[in-house]
Each structure stands twice: as structure tokens, then as C-alpha cells.
């Protein structure tokens, strides 16, 4: 089937009956206020063609999708072995905010897409940058072509006020010598990245570099080397959907990254990047209707990385 906005509209119509069966993230009070019936999808091709349906232009809180962007920024600042000495490359099989595995593995997080791993990446950014929050915003604005993108400070404050578990994770890593900076400062930068508001259109454009051998949309020089891009995609395929990464690979067959704001980005290297948004989550913390929409898209296009 040929990619078109009509195809995307038909996919959203097909998954719309799932609305009401999931649950909006309510442990972050500011996120609990997002209307549960929102549903949008955008696909950007490596040539820059854009196809959209539903609420594709409405900004939302990207949450853990930011972890892929933070890792990308870190990879532009550090030798890769400096990063992988402090965070692993393995799926966790545990909830994204688990302390148990971190204690067992002596403060080395399993991967950069669970909270502990993302906090290590934020710590690395804090060490190397004088203004990590601003640099992260500059990166997403440049990648998406949208200079108006901002972080929602109400959401960032809300997350910071409910950050005891993330603080515990950071202090545990500090106890094992795997955290360099002041915990409070790193947490604020971490939550600021999670609170960035982007639309499906923004995100589909922003992540094209991962589908295009490291080259961002409209650019000629790579942000990341092709080899590094391949490695990031491998991590997204194995670790990007919390402890549901295997099921997502089985059903959708694309590298992806989700966030509890209800967004999921996924990509087919050499072809396209897609972002879907529906705030209601399943038990693993991934968008319920969003996952179903991506499964249908992969099926209709007959595309998968496997």
C-alpha cells in the first residue's frame, strides 16, 4: 500500500475504538490534565515528504522520547567508550524506574533509555556543557526545523516535586561512583528535557537523522556517524519501549522510543520516521492506541526491519 495522509487517517479511524481502554499518566499531575481523546500521527520520509492525520500538529510532553535526543547529544560530545563505560546496552526487563537491578549491578544502568541510564547521560551532559538545557533545546529546534519549541515549566516543576524515586536512583549511582555532578542540578536538567513539548510533525522530522545514516532533515553533514546511528537504532529496537520492547519488535518491527506523554517515534532506516500520539497508556507505560496504529502502519506498508 502507498503511504498517504488518507492511509494514516484510515489507520486512526481503525484504532479510535481503543480510546477509553488505556489510562493517562497520572503520577505526574500536569500530565493527568491532558485530554485522553487526542490521537495523531505524522510520517516524514528521508526525502522530506510529510504525511499527517488527526492531532498531528498539537504539541505534547515528549517525556522519555527525550532520552534518545539526550543520548544523541552526548554522542556528539564524548567518545563512545566513555559513555558505555558508565551505562550498558542491554534490555532491562524491569520497570523503567527500578532500583533493584541497579543495586544488583552496582550502579551501572542496563541501558540509556531507562531512568537510571538517562540520568547518567544527563550527568555526562552536565559535566561537558555549561548550559545543557539550552543545548538540548537548540538541538531539537534544529532537527525539527521549529524554533518555537519550548519546555513546559509547569510539567518540569511537577515532575521535580515528585522526584523522590529518581533522586534515589541518582544517589545510589553516586554511592557506586557512577555520578559526577550535584544530583539536584542533574535532575532539573533531566526533567526539563522530559518536559519539552513537540508535535508528531516536529518529532517525525526531528528523528529523520536516525533513518538517514545520521544526516538530519535538510542537512548535508551528519549529526552522528552512520555507524553510531546504526548502534543507536539497535538500542532503540531492543530497549526503546521499556519492558515491552520485545512485544513491540514482534508487533511493529521498527526501532522506536516511547514516552509516558503518549508519544512513540519509530523508524525504518533508509525510508522514514513516524510519530504517533495518544495519551492513554497500557500497563507497560506505552501508548495503547499508538502501538496499535504503528502495527497497522507496518502491516499496510509491508515494512519491517526484520
UniProtKB/Swiss-Prot annotation:
Top-level taxon of the source organism: Bacteria
GO BP terms: glutamate biosynthetic process; glutamine catabolic process
InterPro entries documented for this protein: Beta-lactam/transpept-like, Glutaminase
Reactions performed catalytically: L-glutamine + H2O = L-glutamate + NH4(+)
Binding-site residues for substrate, renumbered to this chain: 64, 115, 159, 166, 190, 242, 260
EC class: hydrolase
Gene Ontology MF term list: glutaminase activity
EC number(s) from the headed UniProt entry: 3.5.1.2
Pfam families named in the record: Glutaminase (PF04960)
Protein keywords: Hydrolase
SUPFAM superfamilies per the UniProt record, alphabetical: beta-lactamase/transpeptidase-like
UniProt-listed HAMAP family: Glutaminase
Protein family: Belongs to the glutaminase family.
Subunit and interaction comment: Homotetramer.
Protein name: Glutaminase
Species annotation: Aeromonas hydrophila subsp. hydrophila (strain ATCC 7966 / DSM 30187 / BCRC 13018 / CCUG 14551 / JCM 1027 / KCTC 2358 / NCIMB 9240 / NCTC 8049)
Amino acid at each position: 500500500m502507498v503511504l498517504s495522509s488518507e492511509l494514516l487517517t484510515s489507520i486512526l479511524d481503525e484504532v479510535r475504538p481503543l480510546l477509553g481502554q488505556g489510562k493517562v499518566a497520572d503520577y505526574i499531575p500536569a500530565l493527568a490534565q491532558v485530554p485522553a481523546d487526542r490521537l495523531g500521527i505524522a510520517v516524514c520520509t528521508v526525502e522530506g515528504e510529510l504525511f499527517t492525520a488527526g492531532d498531528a500538529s498539537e504539541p505534547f510532553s515528549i517525556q522519555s522520547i527525550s532520552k534518545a535526543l539526550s543520548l544523541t547529544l552526548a554522542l556528539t560530545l564524548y567518545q563512545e567508550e566513555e559513555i558505555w563505560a558508565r551505562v550498558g546496552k542491554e534490555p532491562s526487563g524491569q520497570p523503567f524506574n527500578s532500583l533493584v537491578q541497579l543495586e544488583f549491578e552496582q550502579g551501572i544502568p542496563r541501558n540509556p533509555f531507562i531512568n537510571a541510564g538517562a540520568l547518567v547521560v544527563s550527568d555526562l551532559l552536565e559535566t561537558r556543557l555549561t548550559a545543557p538545557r539550552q543545548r538540548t533545546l537548540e538541538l531539537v529546534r534544529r532537527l525539527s526545523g521549529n524554533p518555537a519549541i519550548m519546555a513546559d515549566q509547569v510539567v518540569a516543576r511537577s515532575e521535580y516535586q515528585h522526584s523522590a524515586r529518581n533522586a534515589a536512583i541518582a544517589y545510589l549511582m553516586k554511592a557506586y561512583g557512577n555520578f559526577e555532578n550535584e544530583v539536584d542540578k542533574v535532575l532539573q536538567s533531566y526533567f526539563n528535557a522530559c518536559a519539552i513539548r513537540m508535535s508528531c510533525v516536529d518529532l517525525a522530522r526531528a528523528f529523520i537523522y536516525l533513518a538517514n545514516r545520521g544526516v538530519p532533515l535538510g542537512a548535508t553533514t551528519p549529526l552522528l556517524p552512520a555507524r553510531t546511528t546504526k548502534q543507536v537504532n539497535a538500542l532503540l529496537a531492543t530497549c526503546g519501549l521499556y519492558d515491552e520492547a520485545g512485544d513491540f519488535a514482534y508487533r511493529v518491527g521498527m526501532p522506536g522510543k516511547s514516552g509516558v506523554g503518549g508519544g512513540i517515534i519509530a523508524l525504518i532506516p533508509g525510508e522514514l520516521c513516524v510519530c504517533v500520539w495518544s495519551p492513554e497508556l497500557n500497563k507497560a507505560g506505552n501508548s495503547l492506541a499508538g502501538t496499535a496504529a504503528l502495527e497497522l502502519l507496518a502491516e499496510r506498508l509491508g515494512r519491517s526491519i526484520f
